[in-house]
Amino acid sequence: MIGQHAPTSDVERLVQRIARLEERVADLQRSLVPLRPFTPVLSAVTTDPSLGSLGSVGGDYTVEGGRCRWAATIVFDGSGVSAGSGAYRVLLPVAPKASITFRHVGSGWWYLPTPTPGFRQVELDASPGGVWARMICEAGEVTHAVPAAPSATAVLSVGGEYPIA
């Protein structure tokens, strides 16, 4: 019995070691997937907002294993900042799988300097039939007025992960 157990123990150790090595290889492969830049867009259902003369956007994403990981920042600043009108949507870098409509695709924060400066938590879900994500806050859909109108120095920072089409 003892002689028969030793090879099994060695085999079990080898199997465990191989599993750890496979996990390490997968971690290394994930770290090597290059980030791709994309230009995020903040849109509103009725009239699009204007980021202003000093406004800026930036984003990056990666696609691996049928999933998209992404991050984006949108900054309002300078003259000409306008909140637009209607519920806000954020452009996703890659179309999500159609079956995930209304499911979570990201989250982040929305810094609004007026009327009371502060950060608001936002969640994003996949809008029906497209590459847009609806913004949601504790008060409901984020709009040009909810939780407050963006003004100069407002910042939206969001990101997430979702299955792609």
Task: Describe each model-derived feature in a short phrase.
Residues R69-A71, I136:
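Beta-strand residues in well-ordered beta-sheet regions across diverse protein folds
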Residues I74-G130:
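Terminal beta-strand-rich extracellular "head" domains
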Residues S9, L35-G65, T73-A98, V142-T153:
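Surface-exposed ligand/attachment interfaces on beta-rich extracellular proteins
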Residues T116-S151:
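Structured beta-strand segments within beta-sheet-rich domains
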Residues T62-R69, D125-G130:
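Short, ordered beta-strand-loop transition motifs
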Residues I2-D48, S53, A98-T101, S157-A165:
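Glycine-rich, low-complexity segments
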